[in-house]
Design a protein with these regions (language model features):
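Beta-barrel outer-membrane channel/assembly domains of diderm bacteria
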Residues: 1-112, 116-165, 174-189, 196-308
C-alpha cells in the first residue's frame, strides 16, 4: 500500500478510535503560606483499537504542569504533573475469557476491572472514591485485573500488580512490592454497594462504599476504609457526599477525613462544595470551594477556584 512519511496506509486498524480531553484549573487559598492564585492544565488523548470486536488495545498519552506540592493544586483532585512533556501514561489490553473481562498492562491499576459504588464527584483529593482509594480503587503498575458480571446486579473482581516489575526486584518476588486485591459489588435501580480487600505489601486494607438515589432527593454516597499496616497502628478513613440536579447543572457537597487517620492521632477533616454546568456535550464549567483542617491547631486551608 502507499506510504506517506514512512507510514503505510492502512497500518492503523479501521476500528481505532481517538478521544481526548483538556482541563484547566485556577484558584487560590487562604490560611497557609502560599496564598497566590495558581493555574494548571492537563491534556490527554486516548487511543482504542479492537482487533476482534470484543477486545481493546488502549494507549493513553498525557501531559500537564500540575506540581507535586503546593498549597492549592496539591489539595484538589486535578490532573497529573509531567513537566509539560508528553508521555505514555497507560498501555493495556482487554480481552474476554469465558464470562471474564481481563485487562493486562503497564501503569495499570489492579482495580481496573473492579466495580465501585461511590457516585460523589469530589474536589478534595483525599475524598476520592468515598475514601476507599487503597482498596476499591487500589492502584498498581504492571497489572492484571479481571472482572466477572453475573448479569443479576452482582459482579466480582480480582487484581494483581507489581510495583517493581520493570526493575531488578522483579514481579511477585520477596524483594518486590506487589498488590493482591479482591472486589465484590451489587447494583440495583436506585442503590449500589461494593466491598474490596487489598494487600499492598506493607499493609492490608478493607473498604466499603455505597450510594442511594431516593426518588426526588439527592443521591447519597459514602465509604469507609480500614487499614492494617505490617508495623504501627491501624488506620481508618471515610467520606460522605450528596449530589443533586440544581437548575441547569449539578451541585455536589461532601466531607470526610483528610486521608487515613492513625489510631490515637488527631482527626482532621476536609469539606468541599462544587457546581457543574455543562455548556454542551463536550465542555463543562465547575466552580468549587473547599476547607481542609490544619494539624495541631494550625490554620485551616480554605480554597476557591474553577475548572473547565
Amino acid at each position: 500500500e502507499a506510504r506517506v512519511n514512512g507510514i503505510e496506509a492502512g497500518s492503523f486498524s479501521e476500528t481505532t478510535t481517538m478521544k481526548g480531553k483538556a482541563k484547566f484549573q485556577i484558584g487560590g487559598t487562604d490560611g497557609v503560606t502560599d496564598e497566590a492564585v495558581m493555574a494548571a492544565y492537563f491534556w490527554e488523548v486516548d487511543l482504542n483499537t479492537s482487533f476482534t470486536g470484543e477486545d481493546n488495545l488502549n494507549v493513553e498519552i498525557e501531559t500537564g504542569n500540575t506540581p507535586d506540592t503546593d498549597s492549592f493544586l496539591a489539595v484538589t483532585d486535578f490532573g497529573k504533573g509531567s513537566g509539560d512533556v508528553l508521555k505514555v501514561s497507560d498501555l493495556n489490553y482487554t480481552f474476554p475469557v469465558g464470562g471474564w473481562s481481563i485487562t493486562v498492562g503497564d501503569s495499570l491499576d489492579a482495580s481496573k476491572q473492579f466495580t465501585g459504588a461511590c457516585s460523589y464527584g469530589n474536589t478534595v483529593d483525599a475524598l476520592s472514591d468515598c475514601g476507599t482509594g487503597n482498596s476499591i480503587a487500589v492502584g498498581g503498575d504492571q497489572s492484571i485485573s479481571a472482572g466477572y458480571d453475573l448479569d443479576n446486579g452482582f459482579s466480582f473482581g480480582v487484581g494483581l500488580s507489581a510495583e517493581d516489575g520493570e526493575k531488578s526486584k522483579g514481579m511477585f518476588t520477596k524483594e518486590g512490592e506487589d498488590i493482591y486485591a479482591l472486589n465484590a459489588a451489587y447494583s440495583a435501580d436506585n442503590y449500589a454497594f461494593a466491598i474490596a480487600y487489598a494487600n499492598v505489601d506493607v499493609a492490608s486494607y478493607w473498604g466499603i462504599n455505597a450510594s442511594y438515589s431516593p426518588d426526588g432527593f439527592p443521591t447519597i454516597s459514602g465509604g469507609y476504609e480500614f487499614g492494617d499496616p505490617d508495623t504501627g497502628k491501624d488506620t481508618t478513613q471515610f467520606a460522605v457526599g450528596l449530589s443533586s440536579d440544581l437548575g441547569p447543572g449539578e451541585v455536589t457537597i461532601g466531607m470526610g477525613t483528610n486521608g487515613a487517620i492513625t489510631d490515637g492521632d488527631e482527626e482532621l477533616y476536609a469539606y468541599d462544595l462544587s457546581y457543574t454546568y455543562k455548556f454542551n456535550d463536550g465542555m463543562s464549567f465547575t466552580p468549587f470551594a473547599f476547607i481542609v483542617e490544619g494539624a495541631n491547631g494550625g490554620d485551616d486551608t480554605t480554597g476557591v477556584g474553577a475548572e473547565i
